[in-house]
Amino acid sequence: LLRGAGGVQGLRADGGGVGVDHTDGVEALQPRATITQYLPIFVAKQAREQLMTVAQAEGRVAKQVPEILFVCVHNAGRSQMAAAYTRTLSGGAVEVRSAGSAPADTINPAVREAMLEEGIDLSAETPKILTTEAVEASDVVITMGCGDACPIFPGKRYEDWELADPADQGIEAVRPIRDEIKRRVSALISELLEPES
């Protein structure tokens, strides 16, 4: 942690020969944070995730399981639900990331509520910006309404899932989107983890 007169100023993390300075992460989140006491924890989590992403994209860390990246515009609804279902339904057999081409400040409250109905808590999640490294480190990239925002790398599997956008929608409108995402994620996991014959 980098501390200054105003408290925590940033985080410097090193791993696998890769360094990331997240001073900008704290500065970006601080004005929006309602509970600043936990801000260093959120920034540290994002730094760890970014370090692993960069290390895998550069081939410094071997992948143990298939990796999926879910991308939507705001990373506040569809991609968050898809990532959460992937974590839950795969039981750790798949590594998952989510990102947005223009991330929102927070997760959509109706999405958070709809996922709680499924026993999945998104309160610790935050919208993240789409990076080239995240795409490069992934085996499968699923986009949802973000057009051509994703860079294309050879050898990656790309799919675009046409789903309604839950932004500014109530829980009643979010539930069918959630259920369709769950169905698609279940099918994707089964396909990825199916033993080769």
Can you describe what each PLM-predicted range is?
Residues 1-18, 24, 34-39, 53-63:
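Basic, alpha-helical nucleic-acid-binding regions used in initiation and control of genome expression
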Residues 17-32, 44-48:
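Amphipathic alpha-helical segments that form the core helices of the histone-fold
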Residues 24, 41, 45-49, 84, ...:
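Short, residue-level hotspots on alpha-helical faces of the histone-fold
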Residues 53-132:
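Conserved active-site segments centered on acidic
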Residues 76, 146-149:
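Short glycine-rich anion-binding loops that position phosphate/pyrophosphate groups of nucleotides
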Residues 138:
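An anion/phosphate-binding loop that grips the pyrophosphate of nucleotide cofactors and donors
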Residues 150-197:
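Phosphate-binding/catalytic loops
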